[in-house]
């Protein structure tokens, strides 16, 4: 396009030309029409930012509530764990004492059984010695009797013994 007034100050119909009046007019039109759009864009952006802030605040409050609930549950679980730990230790101590008492009772029983076995073996050894001594004494007495007794003395001893048995039988 050609300027109508070459070399003078005027309005240029070429909107892409860079004179001050054209720029002012373009800026004025942009500001007039763009003001509403820009204002709407800024208001929308402001509303989105405010909504995001409110949502963030709500999420933060929800997170704080959940954190408090989690802390309360943690305290409760820790208290239960402490209670179980204390009860567990008490149960372990009880079981330990029961085991010690059981072992002590078993040891006492083993000691008693050992003493009974020793006493039994001593009695058996004493009985064996007594039987051996008695048998040797009887063999010695029998040997003495056999060497001392003659036939007549033997018959008199048998007769006296039979008489004793006869009188014992008569008394019953």
Swiss-Prot record:
Q: How does it assemble?
A: F-type ATPases have 2 components, F(1) - the catalytic core - and F(0) - the membrane proton channel. F(1) has five subunits: alpha(3), beta(3), gamma(1), delta(1), epsilon(1). F(0) has four main subunits: a(1), b(1), b'(1) and c(10-14). The alpha and beta chains form an alternating ring which encloses part of the gamma chain. F(1) is attached to F(0) by a central stalk formed by the gamma and epsilon chains, while a peripheral stalk is formed by the delta, b and b' chains.
Enumerate the GO terms in the molecular function aspect.
ATP binding; proton-transporting ATP synthase activity, rotational mechanism
What function does this protein fulfil? F(1)F(0) ATP synthase produces ATP from ADP in the presence of a proton or sodium gradient. F-type ATPases consist of two structural domains, F(1) containing the extramembraneous catalytic core and F(0) containing the membrane proton channel, linked together by a central stalk and a peripheral stalk. During catalysis, ATP synthesis in the catalytic domain of F(1) is coupled via a rotary mechanism of the central stalk subunits to proton translocation.
Q: Does the keyword Ion transport apply?
A: yes
Q: Name one Pfam family in it.
A: ATP-synt_B
What is the protein name given in its UniProt record?
ATP synthase subunit b, chloroplastic
CDD domains for the chain: ATP-synt_Fo_b (cd06503)
